[in-house]
């Protein structure tokens, strides 16, 4: 028996679609509507536990418990540890912070690889490192297919100077799906880490980040019916080695070093 999608039920989950002037919204690459359940969860957090979650009183404890529950749930979805997870405001900002956190670990004259298949979020922040004596190498798509050929990556890595390769899991420009595991192996064999933009991928597939062996992976929750938040995954050893971008007292404090200002409580708690 073929299952039939209950369109009316699906529409009823999204209050914005109930507006008389609601437009058809066919721009899933830009984001998604938010269902009532998310709206209710955010509202409940603000009315029940909107306070600093580290305090010892009851409302703070409830808020902290909700945030930690959400972090554990997200970590389980991607097969990672909660202490390898940063929840920040957007992938663009997470990538920007990461670029500043990784630069001190590179030497002048080191190289990084970027692509012309990526969203600006995972391109511009790395290209700007050229202003700090980092060589930026371009891994370009095949102009006839739009694909990135891993064979074209190998010569870019041949001299051993490349410290980082930034590329998308799925390109929101041409729609190509990249073999993340294979590209990661090539980069690792050359001594480079990888930073993968998964924003256009996670709405269609749920990657096992441990199995992919990526060093860093980024995704935005508002592409998948969530609030305007984004996750940055990093292997614990990689996170522990970054330069702190947060308050001085977070130096050495794991993922907090990549989250200046902290997480938006009501959104993360939803």
Annotate each language-model stretch with its function.
Residues 1-270:
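Pyridoxal 5′-phosphate
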């Amino acid at each position: 028996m073929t299952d039939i999608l209950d369109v009316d039920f699906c529409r009823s989950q999204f209050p914005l679609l109930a507006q008389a002037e609601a437009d058809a919204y066919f721009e899933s690459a830009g984001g998604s509507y938010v269902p009532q359940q998310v709206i209710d969860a955010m509202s409940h957090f603000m009315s029940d536990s909107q306070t600093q979650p580290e305090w010892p009183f009851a409302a703070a404890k409830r808020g902290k418990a909700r945030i930690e529950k959400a972090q554990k749930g997200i970590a389980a979805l991607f097969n990672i540890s909660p202490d390898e997870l940063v929840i920040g405001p957007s992938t663009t900002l997470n990538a920007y912070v990461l670029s500043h956190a990784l630069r001190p670990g590179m030497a002048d004259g080191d190289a990084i690889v970027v692509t012309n298949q990526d969203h600006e979020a995972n391109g511009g922040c790395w290209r700007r490192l050229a202003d700090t004596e980092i060589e930026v190498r371009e891994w370009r798509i095949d102009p006839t297919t739009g694909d990135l050929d891993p064979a074209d990556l190998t010569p870019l890595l041949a001299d051993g100077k490349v410290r980082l390769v930034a590329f998308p899991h799925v390109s929101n420009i041409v729609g190509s799906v990249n073999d993340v595991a294979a590209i990661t192996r090539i980069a690792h064999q050359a001594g480079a880490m990888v930073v993968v933009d998964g924003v256009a991928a996670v709405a269609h597939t749920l990657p096992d980040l441990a199995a992919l062996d990526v060093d860093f992976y980024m995704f935005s929750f508002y592409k998948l019916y969530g609030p305007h938040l984004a996750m940055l995954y990093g292997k614990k050893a990689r996170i522990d080695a970054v330069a702190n971008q947060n308050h001085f007292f977070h130096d050495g404090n794991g993922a907090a070093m990549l989250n200046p200002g902290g997480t938006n409580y009501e959104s993360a708690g939803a």
